[in-house]
UniProtKB/Swiss-Prot annotation:
The protein's name: UvrABC system protein C
NCBIfam families: PRK00558.1-5
Subunit architecture: Interacts with UvrB in an incision complex.
Alphabetical list of InterPro entries matching this protein: GIY-YIG_endonuc, GIY-YIG_endonuc_sf, GIY-YIG_UvrC_Cho, Hlx-hairpin-Hlx_DNA-bd_motif, RuvA_2-like, UVR_dom, UVR_dom_sf, UvrABC_protein_C
Keywords (A to Z) from UniProt: Cytoplasm, DNA damage, DNA excision, DNA repair, Excision nuclease, SOS response
Organism: Kocuria rhizophila (strain ATCC 9341 / DSM 348 / NBRC 103217 / DC2201)
GO molecular function: DNA binding; excinuclease ABC activity
Biological classification of the source: Bacteria, Bacillati, Actinomycetota, Actinomycetes, Micrococcales
The UniProt record lists the keyword Cytoplasm: yes
Amino acid sequence: MADPASYKPARQDIPTNPGVYRFRDEHGRVIYVGKAKNLRNRVSSYFAPLHQLAPKTRAMVTTAAAVQWTVVGSEFESLQLEYTWIKEFAPRFNIAYRDDKSYPYLAVTMSEDVPRAMVTRGEKKPGNRYFGPYSQAWAIRDTLDALLRVFPVRTCTTGVYQRAERSGRPCLLGYIDKCSAPCVGNISQEEHRELADDLCRFMAGHAKPYIRELTRQMNEAAECMDFETAAARRDDVGALERVFERNTVVLTDSTDADFFAIAEDELEAAVQVFHVRGGRIRGQRGWITEKVEDVTTAQLMTNLLQQVYGEAQSGLAPAASGRRRTARHGSEDVVGQHRRTSELAYRQDTIPRAVHVSVLPDEADEIRAWLSELRGSQVTVQRPQRGDKAQLLETVAENARQALTLHKSRRAGDLTTRSASLQQLQEALGLPDALMRIECYDISHVQGTNVVASMVVFEDGLPRKSEYRKFSITGDAARDDTASMYDVIHRRFSRHVEQQRRAAEKGVSTGEVAADDDEGTTRAFAYPPNLVIVDGGPPQVAAAQRALDDLRVTDVHVVGLAKRLEEVWVPDDEFPVILPRASEGLFLMQRVRDEAHRFAITFHRQKRSKAMTVSALDEVPGLGPAKQKALLKHFGSVKKLRAATAEQILEVKGFGPALAVKVAQALGGEAAASSTAPAVDTGTGELLD
């Protein structure tokens, strides 16, 4: 019995998007497939204490050895993908469909003289139209019941229909207007078929014309004082609007395409492929690859297509083009013809008519020609810009981004990998001591305004977020990046030097000194790092080293990590240190640098937004610093304050109606204030109805 804790993912690594998840056993077999509106909440629920889980769930999580997930664009997409995977893998713990029944569909038997609408499972018959699948039979029955208000097609069995024909009396649905009763001649078979066609068009996504027509009839009836008819048409419109759900996973019936997307950073790339056949997702594949050289995304896409479709070429001759060959003796060998037919079917199933990519390959024309030759017919390679295909491609891209994020998190969290990365970095930089603490600094601004800096801390290769710090940079230090870097490093390590002095006076070690300032930051700054990483090249490194020299700090080493080429710069060295692109040491440095950049960008955006808000508030007459502070304290954030209405601002102590309207106008414009705020009598300050 496996311990679920052995494969439990970190909660922050699980996306909050809707999606489908799979549990696999130790042999890699899928044992359970499920869907969720919020993957993080749903997947995390399986890792509660075992005694809190249901017996079936407890058995499943102790049998499993891994959990994976796929992000989709909506809950409806997750339903479709869940269905596909359950049919493909037949998981042992998905007992709802253990009888191998298909998910229920809404079928319209257009192959019959008098089409019938019904809920069906299993094999599909030629000539009929099918819509779905649905997760539950009751859901599609509710849908059909609502649709019969507008499209009263036959739903009875053949036996019931023939009995009604003989007796001349319709069934109950005919009496309550949920069937047009073609069995007794209330409507002709041709008119009934038109009703069935309308139902099929509605279910295929063409709902707006019917809703517009019913709305027009409702308005006309209301104008003629026929309120009973108007109410009936109103209910019809409501029924259609409730049942109409558009699905972007299931494309048109004729769609055969593969969707490729790549997410990458400087060192690695994640690839995701969705295979769509007959308008439905048949399969999904994903890879993580190391970028052993400096390649573009277009080159990565070219290599990817060559690898994926090269599998179809193995063991098969290129498809013949032009005139078909004549056999040696004037007749084709039956076995050979069957083999060629099978090969062609294999090619056309493996290589679809269309290949949709997130970025065009750098040899697009050659790739198209190669794929067309392999398939035996024209293949298009394109990047969709709009519509369902573009939406599905974005879903594939989101999966690639999530896969790369998860891979990096798992790689960073592995103890052996962390130890190797720290040792590699120590050896590459020639440092005497083990890297117990690393600090990284990044500067962020927009054209020299609202200049800020971030400090992130990694201890034993893991982020120590409680010791992250933010710096606001003003005055002469904000003139350029090197001056800003000098200022930040000097401010940070001047506290370290001061802490050492106090410790020496008290006769205690630095680690025993408690916080003694209002912000409680002295203790954090008391611990010096073994290594300081700055985001930048030689100028930034020189500025940081100059700050340490001015403070006479000699036990801290400084390096810079330059973007794009990922070069590591050491002070006073003419050439950079080049770490292998696949090394764990470079991966750690990149992760630390990216975290500092993220933290700096976040702080810069907050400061810029607050500055814009305070600037707008300064222009409001009668709004001084105390009331500005009260506003920010009440709403908790600048974002919430900007979204507040005048009525909500009235709840703040000391704000009257007139002042609340002025604040709302200053932050959201006159339209926002007038649309949400009540009218105010400026003479009395009273609210007007």
